[in-house]
Design a protein with these regions (language model features):
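Cysteine-rich, disulfide-bonded extracellular modules and peptides in secreted proteins
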Residues: 21-125
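C-terminal motif of bacterial Sec signal peptides marking the signal peptidase cleavage site
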Residues: 17-19
Length: 125
């Protein structure tokens, strides 16, 4: 039987212009993302900056109006963005599904093969 989940291959958020010099744990207002490093984004959630790893090959990139965080190589136990809650991605070896639950990626299924097509995660037992 095939199990399907929505894929969260990348996180897209608003670019916050006041993001310079911010660190995880610092206070913030509203919501959105900034790139702290090439492989790390910060998300303003609940009035506090929280780290979100961007382990995929595209890392964390800021454009004129958005921040893109490539989460395609993130691991179980990594933080995930609030916009990814309930969504999944394939583990980097293609043998499991990771799903964002309460702000943390959890391994939810083992697979012989996991693929993402058109935003849909398919896990073959």
């Amino acid at each position: 039987m095939t199990r399907s989940f929505l894929a969260a291959v990348s996180v897209v958020g608003s670019l916050l212009l006041a993001g310079c010099g911010q660190s995880a744990g610092d206070s913030c207002e509203g919501g959105g993302f900034i790139c702290q490093e090439d492989v790390l984004a910060l998300e303003c959630r609940g009035g506090v900056w929280r780290e979100v790893p961007c382990r995929g090959p595209l890392g964390c990139r800021e454009t004129d109006d958005a921040v893109r965080c490539d989460t395609s190589n993130n691991r179980a136990g990594d933080a995930c963005a609030s916009s990814a809650e309930g969504k999944g991605l394939c583990r980097s070896d293609g043998r499991a599904v990771l799903e964002c639950r309460q702000g943390v990626l959890e391994e939810t299924a083992s697979c012989s093969a996991c693929t993402v097509t058109g935003g849909q995660v398919t896990c073959r037992p």
